[in-house]
């Protein structure tokens, strides 16, 4: 994924520079699981090359680069959501061999499809049920509770980070916006900066421990019941 090895026909968009001087690059996935021409598996799959320097991992890059990466995610989500058939856009990253990374050069992926995954559908259904019963968002309530407890990791005006109750993985962390919004495109500039700071903090700690990890954004194209957040799940075995 270094600049000199990129196939021009795969480039979707360059960010931060022209030609081979880009900082972040969006590519069509060379071996996509979904395509706009496949009726049975409709969608788009892109690779986001997070840096042109293959000697760097994301955790080592400055906070402003994290913010730029989030802006790229926002841009790609907006572009892909223009296709009205798209119901779900997953942004995810696999870092390290134990997390399933097959390429050393740091990258993440954007997966857009016309199918809402069953687990996302179930989460939305439970969120709606909670809201009907309690007249509030379940995640907004969880944020308030966790910011007062021992699982709190980081907090500022815009974001909240905590280790979830009964974590699936050691050192798991969830990053939430305090403002209720349903997807990444709704982030304002201040929230992008705070989210970048929080993500840099979490990934830097995992990098120091030498842990592989996956991260993925929980979001939907449009459903106010959903509360946008990011799960970071370390893989230590």
Residue ranges and their predicted role:
Residues 1-105, 111-184, 190, 203-215, ...:
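Active-site microenvironments that recognize anionic phosphate/pyrophosphate groups
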């Amino acid at each position: 994924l270094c600049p000199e090895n990129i196939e021009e026909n795969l480039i979707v968009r360059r960010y931060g520079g022209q030609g081979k001087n880009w900082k972040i690059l969006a590519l069509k996935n060379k071996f996509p699981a979904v395509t706009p021409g496949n009726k049975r598996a409709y969608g788009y799959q892109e690779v986001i090359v997070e840096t042109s320097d293959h000697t760097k991992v994301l955790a080592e890059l400055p906070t402003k680069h994290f913010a730029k990466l989030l802006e790229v995610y926002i841009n790609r989500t907006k572009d892909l959501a223009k296709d009205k058939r798209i119901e779900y856009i997953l942004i995810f990253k696999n870092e390290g061999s134990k997390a399933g990374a097959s390429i050393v050069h740091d990258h993440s992926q954007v997966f857009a499809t016309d199918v809402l995954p069953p687990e996302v559908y179930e989460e939305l259904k439970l969120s709606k049920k909670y809201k009907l019963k309690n007249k509030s968002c379940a995640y907004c309530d969880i944020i308030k509770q966790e910011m007062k407890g021992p699982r709190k990791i980081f907090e500022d005006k815009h974001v909240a980070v905590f280790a979830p109750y009964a974590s699936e993985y050691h050192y798991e962390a969830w990053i939430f916006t305090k403002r209720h919004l349903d997807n990444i495109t709704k982030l304002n500039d201040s929230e992008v900066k705070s989210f970048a700071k929080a993500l840099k903090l979490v990934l830097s700690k995992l990098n120091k421990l030498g842990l592989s990890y996956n991260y993925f954004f929980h979001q939907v194209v449009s459903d106010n019941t959903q509360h946008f957040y990011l799960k970071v799940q370390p893989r230590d075995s």
